[in-house]
Amino acid sequence: MNFYLKKVEKRIKEKNYDVVIDYSSNLLKYKDFDIAIPVFAWVHFSLTFGEQLSADKIEKYKKQYKKYDKILAICDTMRNEFVDILGMDKTKVELVYNPINLKVIREKAENVNPDYEKYLKENYFLQVSRLTQQKQPEHLVDIYYKLKQRGIKEKLYFIGNGEKVELIKQKIKEYNLENDVILLGQIENPYPFFKNAKLFVHTAKYEGLPTVLLESLAFGTPVVAYDCPTGPKDILGGNSEYGELIPLNDKDMFVEKVYELINNNEKYENYKKISLIRADDFSMESNKAKLKELIENTNF
């Protein structure tokens, strides 16, 4: 056991904590790490990322997680992985969402940088993420091009940076979308853009529990997203109750659902209203109450 973990062990014993919550899922792999209180692993990633796990990998995960008193999963899909793949008892794996501070982000949305005011006056679709292979942002340019051919007027904004920027620029040039697809780069406070967006659009090929979807719901901004492993289904509902869920990598379906949504005012307004209600399920208050209940019901 390294020096850092020895310090952690000493501090835990000195402070007489009730529970330790391990975000790394690595704390209990050290045999000489010895504390006599419950330890929860709060898992923020998929075990599979949509891939088939090898027998060796499954066995490794079983050994790693069986030592914990509770597993906290941030979405139902992850929770099911522990039960279905690792064979864990359902009572040991609890659902505790990654919370968002609704009050703070809504306050930040009112603080508008004058440099961005002209962009916020436009009608636009929004994507906020690292522009990487995982997020597949180039899919959105292809989708947007087809929507432009069908007559939509909204622009498409990207907030973020990453290795896919050059590919996006190439596609923008290829499709002659220089005036319609805007790369805004990294922005310290993106929340005014969340608040004013017509739609939030998301084409990742895998996720954990994507915070950007929750932040969109917090402003009543309807979401259209790929049904990737894991997260979007847990947020938007398996039957698209809280936003449009699109089969993974189905660009044509994505085009159809976006076009339908912006031309169906009743459906659009319903998503705006229900998004705000859904966001409350992921609030700090809801998750604090859940954690408090779990700790109080743990046998010490």
What role is predicted for each listed range?
Residues 4, 21-27, 43:
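Short His-centered aromatic/hydrophobic patch
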Residues 123-146, 152, 163-169, 252:
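A conserved mid-protein helix/loop that constitutes part of the nucleotide-sugar donor-binding site
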